Amino acid sequence: MPHTLPETELHNPQSTKPPLDPHLKALENEAIHIFREVAAEFERPVMLYSIGKDSSVLLHLARKAFYPGRIPFPLLHVDTGWKFREMIAFRDEMVAKYDLDLVAHTNPRGAAENVTPFTHGSALYTDIMKTEALRQALDAGQYDAAFGGARRDEEASRAKERIYSFRTPDHRWDPRNQRPELWNVYNGMIRKGESVRAFPLSNWTEVDIWRYIQAEDIPIVPLYFAKKRPVVERDGMLILAEDPRLELLPGEVKREEVIRFRTLGCFPLTGAIRSEADTLDDIIAELETATVSERQGRAIDRDQAGSMEKKKREGYF
């Protein structure tokens, strides 16, 4: 059944915007159904909020799912201290604008030991500041379900993960031990200490995300749009060179290029792409002819063969 809303900023009958096409409407309905199912089945759900485009769509869908009430669970942001400055500013703007309950967590051990992408390398840094930090935050909040914005088209290990992804008491995932999911029937039974990661965007593609952002006029971090920015080329990636903590290596030169980001994370580990796409129409047109995954710009996915699956088995997003 379609999910409609009274006249609000989320749904305005007087709007001149065309209605969602049937494909996007079906994806929206599925996602809203998943949000409501998890909220009804679990005692302490939480939504992982990484501030990127998928999180922005996830937040919009959550607001739709529970209108006219507030979102009935907090948002959790694992703050490594190395996100793009524009991401943190955007996060704070969204929290204030929509009166969100945000929990931000930084791994105290990592902060005390000054763990950084530069000093510890991407693999160890990600394990301590992201995976370990996420497990800490989930334990501290005693959350039994966590919404995430992962999509199956992103990466091989995510392609085989169910919408309800079951985790052991220490948050580990076993891809060989997944439950069947028949149509829209989800089995949320868990033992004490276990939890579920739920992925309402599982069946969306990157282009679906952008078309929905355009159709619903969803705010996103400006870094997704092309403009001239300072960059340095390192390990085959274009790294944004705005943060004073980025020290140039011998032979490196900072220069201005017209770039944008297809994916956002910690700035030292996230590569930009050369692009002139500075509007939503341009971004969608660019992606329709893209031949590589958006995660090609993530250094953490290059650590070793199967690195993402290894991280997910250990409790990563």
Swiss-Prot record:
Residues 1-21, 295-317 are annotated as: Disordered. Residues 1-10 have a biased composition (Basic and acidic residues). It comes from the Bacteria. It is an enzyme of class 2 (transferase). It catalyses: sulfate + ATP + H(+) = adenosine 5'-phosphosulfate + diphosphate. Its EC number is 2.7.7.4. One of its GO terms (molecular function) is ATP binding. The keyword ATP-binding applies. Pathway: Sulfur metabolism; hydrogen sulfide biosynthesis; sulfite from sulfate: step 1/3. Keywords: ATP-binding, Nucleotide-binding, Nucleotidyltransferase, Transferase. One of its GO terms (biological process) is hydrogen sulfide biosynthetic process. HAMAP family: Sulf_adenylyltr_sub2. PANTHER family: SULFATE ADENYLYLTRANSFERASE SUBUNIT 2. Heterodimer composed of CysD, the smaller subunit, and CysN. Belongs to the PAPS reductase family. CysD subfamily. With CysN forms the ATP sulfurylase (ATPS) that catalyzes the adenylation of sulfate producing adenosine 5'-phosphosulfate (APS) and diphosphate, the first enzymatic step in sulfur assimilation pathway. APS synthesis involves the formation of a high-energy phosphoric-sulfuric acid anhydride bond driven by GTP hydrolysis by CysN coupled to ATP hydrolysis by CysD. This is Sulfate adenylyltransferase subunit 2. The gene is cysD.
